[in-house]
Amino acid sequence: MQTATALEDSANAPSPAASSQGQFDREIVPIDTADAGNSTKRSPLKVALIMVALCCAVFLHALDNTIITTALPTITAAFDLDAAYTWIGSTYLLAVAASTMVWAKISDVFGRKPIILSANLCFFTGSLIAALSANFAMLIAARAIQGIGGAGVNVLANICVGDLFSQRKRGLYYGVIGGVWAVALSLGPVVGGSLTESISWRWCFYINLPLCAVVFVIIILLLDVKTPKTPFGKGIAAIDWVGAALSIGSTLMILLALSLGGQTEPWNSATVICLVVFGFIGWILCFSWEASLAKYPLLPVSIFKQIPTLAVLAACFIQSYAFVASAYYLPLYFQAVLGATPILSGVYLLPTAVSISISSTATGVYMRKTGQYLTPIYIGFVLQTLGYGLFIDLGPTANWAKIIVFQIIGGLGVGFNFQAPMVALQAFISPRELAMATSAYNFMRNVSGAISVVIGQTVFQNEMSKHQESLATILGPQLAAKLAGTGASASTDLIRSLPSPQRDVVHGVFANSMKSMWIMYTAFSAAALVVCPFLGKMVLREDHTETVTGLAAENAAREERLRQEKEKKDAKIRKCQVN
């Protein structure tokens, strides 16, 4: 038997933010397992190959987030849909958010490599079913399967980087992954539109099949991580299925409420209210279960007990909230106001994608050289707030100098915080909690994005409603009604078909309505500057022991957690006896 070490928080360790060296006091807990081992020395070539494998996997998932956006009108016509077409995108995002944390915990038990391969296979299966869909229900089911697989691929790529590299080094690799993500998101509409126009919308899904196969082979050959020999039955029994059911069910209820509210159901409808209420009750039950009853918790409750980690999650929420706004509403501006085609709107978004890639990678280099993360986080939120504030000045006519410069400023800000908060979060936790904390971070990012789209759309629709009388006078009641409510953001083709005088009026109304939305996003982004002082200052560690996965490691972590809880209770009893 080999002996490895897992670094666990000492029960009486001081706050990391208060430590002069910015590091935890750690206690070494022996883990006896044949699968354990110390960090492997890898050559630069080996590291590069590992990153190629992970980046390919992330690229595929990110591309699928946006590749269908330009194919939606064609898919809508093929299946004779109405407002239900929005579920083609929503189903994918719901599945991603709901399944992220479960994938992370399964990988703690069975190891990273077999689980990321399973996630890739799940994504492949969903893509194949989507490409062959004979009806709308089949397509929606396929998108759910795709989302589940995509969630696993994305979160496990981030977890693998945390497993393999020290805090000091991993910032660079996270920065590279962030850059790949931004480029893929921008290319999605262009690739999807080109495939739809030249071949068929089904190729938006067929294209995933050879790419998935290549990624599968690359991961098998290049991803060098240790895999425990966990018996399948015992491993399945060790998963916290109660916590998984509570977290998935609660998340789905809340996100379904956000998807339905203001779209197919009024916000004050019984359906929406019940989904929200029972969703929050479910999360309260989930936290209670994870904190006191779960044998192998799905959620690291400890991160919600420290101010710095709570601040990091808040920063993550704000960054994702703003990023989704640019990814979702800038294309709407390009199409509805400037009259761009969906493909061109993807091209016009390139300044945002390129600037995010540059600042995300630069942040990783900075963290690797200095061991600090606070400076890029502060700079990022300042630039992000400035950039989104400048978006308020975008008018009904194209001013390309403004459009490009404003995107660069906002994109740089978003990129500085694309991965830095995740590194900050990992600096405050024990290595055994890395997978759970990383999944919680990704979960927060996904939920924030969903909320951002809904709130942004609500603000925009409310502003559009204020102009209905003037639009009805110019366009007539029927055309004006198509630009009201939920139809506003889905009417870009209608706007392009209008005669020039009427089209100019509509462009002005859309531009003015979007100003209020950008004001909201600017104010929300500025709130991050209030959160930043609570992040805590840590020096990123250079030493590293690779995370050990498997049942033996899970049992050791549980025993250590129970020991710490007992010591805290004993300390309280002694304090009461003294008093």
UniProtKB/Swiss-Prot annotation:
It is a multi-pass membrane protein. Keywords: Glycoprotein, Membrane, Transmembrane, Transmembrane helix, Transport. Residues 1-23 are annotated as: Disordered. GO terms for cellular component: plasma membrane. The keyword Nucleotidyltransferase does not apply. The keyword Membrane applies. Coiled coil: none annotated. GO terms for molecular function: transmembrane transporter activity. It comes from the Eukaryota. The chain crosses the membrane at residues 48-68, 83-103, 121-141, 145-165, 171-191, 203-223, 236-256, 269-289, 298-318, 336-356, 374-394, 403-423, 438-460, 516-536. Residues 10-20 have a biased composition (Low complexity). Disulfide bonds: none annotated. Belongs to the major facilitator superfamily. TCR/Tet family. MFS-type transporter; part of the gene cluster that mediates the biosynthesis of pyrrolopyrazines, secondary metabolites showing insecticidal activity. Probably involved in the secretion of peramine and other pyrrolopyrazines. This is MFS-type transporter ppz2. It comes from Metarhizium majus (strain ARSEF 297).
